[in-house]
């Protein structure tokens, strides 16, 4: 009976650690996705003014 309890306790402990690691990995993946969206916004902010200046130069002349 004691060995069964130890085995179950060990399985529970390992399962808890595994679940914790999966949650951390999922959170890290979500952060990476957020970073990509922020980079896209930064690229758009840099890209649109340049196009505006080019069109202004072409249409202004």
Curated annotation (Swiss-Prot):
The keyword Secreted applies. It is found in: Secreted. GO terms for biological process: defense response to bacterium; innate immune response. It comes from the Eukaryota. InterPro entries: Frog_antimicrobial_propeptide. Expressed by the skin glands. One of its GO terms (cellular component) is extracellular region. Residues 23-44 form a propeptide. Residues 1-22 form the signal peptide. Keywords: Amidation, Amphibian defense peptide, Antibiotic, Antimicrobial, Cleavage on pair of basic residues, Immunity, Innate immunity, Secreted, Signal. The modification Leucine amide is found at residue 59. Its main location: secreted. The keyword Signal applies. Amphipathic alpha-helical antimicrobial peptide with activity against Gram-positive bacteria (M.luteus), Gram-negative bacteria (E.coli), and fungi (S.cerevisiae). Stimulates insulin release from pancreatic beta-cells in a dose-dependent manner, without increasing intracellular calcium. Does not protects BRIN-BD11 beta-cells against cytokine-induced apoptosis. In vivo, intraperitoneal injection together with a glucose load into mice improves glucose tolerance with a concomitant increase in insulin secretion. Belongs to the frog skin active peptide (FSAP) family. Temporin subfamily. This is Temporin-1Tg. The lineage of its organism: Eukaryota, Metazoa, Chordata, Craniata, Vertebrata.
């Amino acid at each position: 009976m004691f060995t069964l309890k130890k085995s179950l306790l060990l399985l529970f402990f390992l399962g808890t650690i595994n679940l914790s690691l999966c949650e951390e990995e999922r959170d890290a993946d979500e952060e990476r996705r957020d970073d990509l969206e922020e980079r896209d916004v930064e690229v758009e902010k840099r890209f649109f003014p340049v196009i505006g200046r080019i069109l202004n130069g072409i249409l202004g002349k």
